[in-house]
């Protein structure tokens, strides 16, 4: 359903939790979060206290307007907190549930998974997201531990444990300069390891040194900055998505779920895309650090985007503040004319504001760095999306497109 006005309490309040802040057992070259530890140099331990855990769980559940409540545990590396921490969290969730249904999902690099962890996740129906960048030669390029040792073998051991215990899991893969030219190797790898739900995230960062030791630029810092070497190019991103889509649409619709394809079809239907990057507005997904500091978004953990602390302001006050509403609405309002006149604005919505540091041909600021790649993708998939939209509108499965392509019933002209 389309909404023309911003209705803050129509959506569940959502805040991801960082129980260990930026602490991690890996040191991935492209990680945007490791350096956030520099924001908390005065804290000896970047560990969430039991007191804060209880305060957050009580307030988070109490602030919900829906019967289902989703907790998302994020890092850093979440499993660097002991299992007892998450057992304590579940006890507190039950204590404060007040009749609501509680769900949990957790993101991990997979290297610390054990039988005990997996038994806990299975018994309590936790969804586990695993960060893995495809086959070993691609994954190990950037995802190494602090000693410079590769992590792929340990990640796969963790995935095999999840499968052994029947834990529901999905994969999140970062697409970078090194792996972007091999989309089919990537995609087929995930199918081979039995992963049905896949998220591909393009990495784009600018280097800009700060006095506190941080080296990544925020959107608010309009200084030029230097594009990080690991960043994907717009052309690589467009080619990656198109090649991957061509195989998926012929063989795997309804069998394997690629987040950006699902979200694109949702936007084609005029429905909510399910991810903030492709929505018209954002700002509904905040993040809370280990000490209770709340920020506008996981990709905006910078001093200028800090909303406050849970000890001095409530989650509702912060997440439904005028400041946060403006942050979310600016996703659309700050778009340059080129975007607002684009035929694919409805599908793209300017993607993530953090990547909007380029200029249009007319010199207007605010263009997404990946614009060319997104446009290439949407132009390429448009006839397929039109077909699948028509199937859904007529209460038929979009997977019918595979048979139509096989039989030559769907002629694609560009």
Enumerate the predicted regions with their spans.
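Flexible mid-to-C-terminal extensions adjoining Fe-S/redox cofactors in radical SAM and related proteins
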Residues: 301-414
């Amino acid at each position: 359903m389309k909404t023309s006005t911003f209705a803050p309490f129509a959506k569940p309040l959502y805040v991801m939790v960082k129980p260990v802040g930026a602490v991690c057992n890996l040191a991935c070259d492209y990680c945007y979060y490791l350096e956030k530890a520099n924001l908390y140099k005065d804290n000896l331990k970047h560990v969430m206290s039991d007191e804060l855990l209880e305060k957050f769980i009580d307030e988070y559940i109490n602030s919900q307007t829906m019967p289902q409540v989703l907790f998302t545990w994020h890092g850093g590396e979440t499993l660097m907190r002991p299992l007892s921490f998450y057992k304590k969290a579940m006890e507190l969730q039950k204590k404060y549930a007040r009749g609501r249904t509680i769900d949990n999902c957790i993101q991990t690099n997979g290297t610390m998974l054990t039988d005990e962890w997996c038994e806990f996740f299975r018994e309590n129906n936790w969804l586990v997201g695993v960060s893995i960048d495809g086959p070993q030669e691609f994954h190990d390029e950037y995802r190494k531990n602090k000693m410079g040792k590769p992590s792929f073998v340990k990640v796969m051991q963790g995935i095999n444990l999840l499968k052994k215990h029947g834990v529901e899991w999905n994969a999140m893969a970062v697409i970078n300069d090194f792996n972007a030219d091999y989309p089919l190797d990537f995609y087929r790898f995930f199918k081979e390891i039995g992963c049905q739900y896949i998220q591909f995230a393009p990495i784009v960062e600018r280097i800009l040194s700060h006095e506190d030791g941080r080296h990544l630029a925020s959107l608010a810092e309009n200084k030029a900055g230097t594009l990080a070497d690991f960043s994907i190019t717009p052309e690589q991103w467009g080619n990656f998505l198109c090649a991957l889509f061509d195989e998926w649409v012929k063989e795997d619709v309804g069998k394997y779920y690629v987040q950006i394809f699902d979200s694109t079809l949702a936007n084609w239907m005029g429905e909510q895309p399910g991810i903030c990057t492709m929505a018209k507005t954002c700002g509904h997904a905040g993040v809370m650090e280990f000490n209770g500091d709340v920020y506008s978004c996981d990709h905006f953990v910078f001093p200028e985007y800090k909303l406050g602390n849970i000890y001095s302001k409530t989650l509702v006050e912060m997440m439904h503040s005028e400041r946060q509403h403006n942050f979310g609405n600016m996703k659309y309002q700050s778009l340059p004319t080129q975007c607002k006149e684009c035929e694919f604005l409805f599908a793209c919505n300017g993607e993530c504001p953090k990547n909007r540091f380029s200029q249009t041909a007319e010199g207007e600021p605010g263009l997404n760095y990946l614009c060319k790649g997104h446009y290439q993708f949407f132009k390429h998939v448009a006839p397929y999306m039109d077909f699948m939209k028509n199937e859904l509108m007529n209460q038929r499965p979009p997977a019918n497109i595979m048979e139509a392509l096989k039989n030559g019933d769907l002629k694609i002209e560009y």
